[in-house]
């Protein structure tokens, strides 16, 4: 009868559902199954409350959930970790992120590093962190005062560094690390992975946090970045160019460009409506200079009075921040804020 048929179908559906739940309970590492439970919570607690993907300015470096100011760095505990060096350094939201991955591969398909045959895959990176979080689960779940009593194997897994000391298999789960340095440093921080993720995983935040540890705690980063950091700190730009060359593009336009300080100004004159922040690339890089000149020409043709800082500009620290040197970024940012406050700049145009 119809009633019997409905009962049989209902029984089969219930049996299949129970079998699925038993399977998931027996194999908690089945991430494809767990995302069905976790996706809602991950999206609910997403980084941006307005519903936008987890893109935009990088989050400040935090210790124990509190954003830190490097002016007060001496007040930190001796055991404080800047950035993320082991799985236990991640926040609860970061651990929720990696365990919510659906393994759909959208992030990987859009990643410029992966598509140019670099070892980085946002998907594999997320899965590697997920596997490490599962392996260290007893340590993560234990109370802080009980962790020292755990078995030494568990302690060894929990203390395993995320980034290996040398090159090798990019994703080898060995005592030397969870992933190779090449994986970490292949990221361009473009944000394509975050934009494509259907469950709002913040890949870039996690990558930059691991870079911060490598730079600020382990002092283990590519040699090329050493030159970058020194140039920004000493010369005020990533390429080590002289500050006097910031005005070179002005000689290539056929209209006057006012430069702050050339007439002895202490602050932006009242007749100047906008300060044009040219930036390092806009002042030194040939292709970017074309954009700088085009914007200046548009302002001139529109009759807008504007002024540039010229030699008074310095790097905003963004390259250092993307590379994990949060200390250098904050130093550059505070220097620029001080300059802009001194000259009383209220309207700024950037490209």
Predicted features by range, described:
Residues 1-76, 83-84, 123, 127, ...:
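Membrane-embedded alpha-helical bundles of multi-pass integral membrane proteins
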Residues 3-14, 23-26, 90, 96-99, ...:
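Generic recognition of flexible, low-complexity loop/linker segments
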Residues 17-21, 104-108, 187-191, 206-207:
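Short acidic (Asp/Glu) and glycine-rich catalytic loops that position anionic groups and cofactors
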Residues 30, 39-46, 50, 113, ...:
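Short, well-ordered loop/turn and helix-capping segments at boundaries between secondary-structure elements
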Residues 36-39, 46, 54, 110, ...:
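Short helix/loop capping segments that flank catalytic or ligand/cofactor-binding pockets
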Residues 56-115:
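Acidic, Ser/Thr-rich low-complexity segments on the non-lumenal side of membrane proteins
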Residues 89-98, 120-124, 133-351:
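Iron-sulfur-cluster electron-transfer modules
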